[in-house]
UniProtKB/Swiss-Prot annotation:
GO MF annotation, one: ATPase binding
Active-site annotation: S96 (nucleophile), H121
Domain of life, source organism: Bacteria
Keyword Protease on entry: yes
Family matches, as PROSITE patterns: CLP_PROTEASE_HIS (PS00382)
Family recorded in the similarity comment: Belongs to the peptidase S14 family.
Protein name, per record: ATP-dependent Clp protease proteolytic subunit 3
Enzyme class name: hydrolase
Species of origin: Rhizobium johnstonii (strain DSM 114642 / LMG 32736 / 3841)
Any one GO cellular component localisation term in the record: endopeptidase Clp complex
Enzyme Commission number: 3.4.21.92
Quaternary structure and interacting proteins, as annotated: Fourteen ClpP subunits assemble into 2 heptameric rings which stack back to back to give a disk-like structure with a central cavity, resembling the structure of eukaryotic proteasomes.
Length: 194
């Protein structure tokens, strides 16, 4: 490795730390990418740290294809658990377990950018093994689906039977459709709108 390569690597590290410090100061968290245990641990730690630092509002930007439901549950529950108010800003796509996290705040604090797309659907699982184990997993997925649909119905104001029907297959919504559906309170185009 030559000196120029070393200088480039050295320059990258402080920028990352500086960005993290600025995000902490601005009380902003980014949930970008798949929802998994590692992301849940990071986001929950950030939420607890921000709550310990101050009661000021927190902003969470969500752009996720979804992922592990239980990891989404832990973020969803932690958002409700901490004292500061949390604002959700959807961007890109807010799908599946990402939508579960997104609805952790009251509707009036759920915003999105104009080109955000939302995806609601039933959870899926891949299991194999003995028939009795597959049956157990199927029952658990059905219970999870019922629980998630109750959460989504409460968050949107839609009747549970409509949520059941809509999430039976992939249900895509534009930002405007998500607003009409009750997922989003406002579509924003700048930080000044928040």
């Amino acid at each position: 490795m030559n000196d120029e390569d070393q200088d480039d690597k050295t320059k990258e590290l402080p920028l990352g730390k500086e960005t993290e410090a600025n995000l902490f100061k601005s009380r902003s968290i980014f949930i970008y990418g798949p929802i998994n245990q590692e992301l849940a641990q990071k986001v929950c730690s950030q939420l607890v740290a921000l709550a310990a630092a101050s009661d000021e509002d927190i902003r969470i930007y969500v752009n996720s294809p979804g992922g592990h439901v239980e990891s989404g549950d832990s973020i969803h529950d932690m958002i409700k658990f901490i004292k500061p108010k949390v604002w959700m800003i959807g961007t890109g796509w807010v799908a599946s377990a990402g939508a579960l996290i997104y609805v952790a705040t009251p509707k009036e604090r759920r915003l999105c950018l104009p080109n955000t797309r939302f995806l609601l659907h039933q959870p899926s699982g891949g299991t194999r093994g003995m028939a009795s184990d597959i049956e157990i997993q199927a029952r658990e997925i059905i219970k999870m689906n019922e629980r998630l649909n109750r959460i989504m119905a409460a968050a949107t104001g839609q009747p549970l039977d409509k949520i059941d029907k809509d999430t039976d297959r992939d249900y895509w919504l534009s930002a405007e459709e998500a607003k009409d559906y009750g997922l989003v309170s406002r579509i924003v185009t700048s930080q000044a709108d928040i």
